[in-house]
């Protein structure tokens, strides 16, 4: 069997590469999520990556590889939030893989959040998954969310300075922000460092990973607040993207 065939299905090769193995129930939920995405894509443009390695590598594996420490303590209670959830990655996959966690999914597109709610219900995750249909700038200023999360994350949302402005205000004092990135350069690092000075946060980890089956290179960035985030951040809707911090 070729490597491509191995990684097109949720077999042992995939989980060995990840260094974590789901329970039979978790695997069934991930397969069910794939089927739900196929159904919902007929009505809502959630994601085109729903078949074979596109799903298992570019969605599931890519959502989980930065979370090795969390996966080793999967039953630990933790509050997580996924900004720009789209089709449910990484948020729904994390809800499956981390049974001790409560997950808040945020997306500004109402049709997508309706799909997320329905999929979470079908997967039996309603008790641990909350869905908010709003812009990230509003989430970060809402007292129900600001400063309350152990882990705030975003995948394929915007540039690192913009994403940092969305995530850092959501962190509790011991919390971490996780930025999923593809390409990462010294210039990207400089831009992020400038933004973090405004947000009173530091970069505490940067890790590079090659995806299986030559599916590309990914980076994870971990941020931690050094002081309470200034109340002015995140700025009003649209401002972070139009005028990134430090630009």
From Swiss-Prot:
Subcellular location: Cytoplasm
InterPro entries the record matches: rRNA_ssu_MeTfrase_G (IPR003682), SAM-dependent_MTases_sf (IPR029063)
Top EC group: transferase
Entry binding sites for S-adenosyl-L-methionine: 84, 89, 136-137, 155
Major site of localization recorded for this protein: cytoplasm
Protein EC: 2.1.1.-
Highest taxon in the source lineage: Bacteria
Key words of the record: Cytoplasm, Methyltransferase, rRNA processing, S-adenosyl-L-methionine, Transferase
A cellular-component GO term for this protein: cytosol
One GO molecular-function entry: rRNA (guanine-N7-)-methyltransferase activity
PANTHER family recorded: S-ADENOSYL-L-METHIONINE-DEPENDENT METHYLTRANSFERASES SUPERFAMILY PROTEIN
Family: Belongs to the methyltransferase superfamily. RNA methyltransferase RsmG family.
Stated role: Specifically methylates the N7 position of a guanine in 16S rRNA.
Name this protein carries in UniProt: Ribosomal RNA small subunit methyltransferase G
Species annotation: Prochlorococcus marinus (strain MIT 9303)
Gene: rsmG
């Amino acid at each position: 069997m070729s490597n491509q065939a191995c990684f097109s299905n949720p077999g042992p090769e995939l989980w060995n590469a990840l260094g974590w193995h789901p329970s039979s129930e978790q695997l069934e939920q991930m397969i069910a999520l794939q089927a739900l995405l196929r159904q919902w894509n007929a009505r809502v443009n959630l994601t085109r990556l729903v078949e074979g390695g596109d799903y298992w590598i570019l969605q599931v594996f890519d959502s989980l590889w930065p979370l090795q420490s969390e996966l080793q303590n999967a039953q630990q209670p933790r509050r997580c939030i996924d900004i720009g959830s789209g089709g449910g990655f990484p948020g729904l996959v994390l809800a499956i893989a981390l049974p001790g966690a409560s997950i808040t999914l945020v997306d500004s597109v109402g049709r997508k959040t309706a799909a997320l709610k329905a999929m979470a219900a079908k997967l039996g995750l309603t008790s641990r998954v909350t869905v908010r249909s709003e812009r990230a700038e509003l989430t970060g200023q809402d007292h129900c969310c600001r400063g309350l999360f152990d882990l705030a994350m975003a995948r394929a949302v915007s540039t690192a300075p913009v994403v940092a402005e969305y995530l850092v205000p959501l962190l509790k004092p011991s919390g971490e922000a996780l930025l999923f990135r593809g390409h990462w350069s010294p210039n990207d690092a400089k831009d992020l460092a400038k933004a973090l000075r405004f947000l009173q946060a530091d970069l505490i980890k940067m890790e590079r990973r090659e995806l299986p089956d030559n599916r590309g290179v990914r980076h994870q960035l971990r941020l931690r607040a050094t002081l309470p985030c200034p109340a002015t951040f995140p700025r009003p809707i649209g401002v972070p993207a139009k005028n990134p911090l430090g630009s």
